[in-house]
A protein has these predicted regions:
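Short alpha-helical scaffolding segments that buttress acidic/His motifs in well-ordered protein cores
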Residues: 1-2, 75
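Short, surface-exposed glycine/acidic/tryptophan-bearing loops
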Residues: 12-33
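Extracytoplasmic and endomembrane cell-envelope/extracellular-matrix remodeling and assembly machinery
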Residues: 31, 36-64, 72-73, 77-175
Length: 175
């Protein structure tokens, strides 16, 4: 789903102000444990936002009675949008599966996009793609707590680490 959401770009921002790898809106991110302030936004943190996305998807999967297609549609457009489409279909005596619902255009293409990406990722070479590179081994992380308001340049100088490296390890810092 992260490919469909952001093309694996942790700095992605949508026109609706959903941000990060998993394209969390502010309220949804907060609801699933992602902190946000004027200098820090965990929606941009790949590790923390992935944990939050897993929790959110689990919640949606349960809400839509084990139906992953409806859960993914709700991840994209909101559970209220999907619930309203289901109610409308029921009132009209129509099926309530993902493929039959009247959903927003973007959401109608969301699950097929996920299936397409999943199919390609299962056999990249068959579809003309290079195998994925191995993930680089990053050195172990160590947390250093810094008082708010300390300029990144000062942190960089004290730790003797360039600001780009600090940003690499701390993608949730908003500069």
């Amino acid at each position: 789903l992260a490919v469909v959401e952001s093309n694996f770009n942790p700095d992605a921002r949508s026109s609706a102000n959903a941000v990060g790898l998993w394209q969390f809106m502010s309220y949804t991110g907060k609801s699933f444990g992602l902190a946000r302030s004027w200098w820090h936004d965990e929606r941009y943190d790949p590790e923390k936002s992935t944990v939050a996305a897993a929790k959110y998807l689990k919640h949606l999967h349960k809400r839509f009675k084990g139906n992953w297609e409806l859960a993914m549609a709700a991840y994209n457009s909101g559970s209220g949008t999907v619930r309203r489409a289901i109610r409308k279909a029921k009132r009209a005596g129509k099926p309530t599966d993902y493929w039959s619902l009247k959903l927003p255009r973007e959401t109608r293409g969301y699950v097929p996009a996920f299936y397409a990406v999943a199919t390609i990722f299962k056999d990249l070479e068959k579809y003309g793609f290079e195998p994925l590179p191995q993930l680089m081994d990053l050195p172990p992380k160590r947390a250093v707590v810094v008082a708010g308001g300390v300029p990144l340049k000062q942190i960089s100088e004290v730790l003797k680490i360039d600001s780009q490296t600090i940003r690499l390890y701390n993608p949730s810092i908003r500069l």
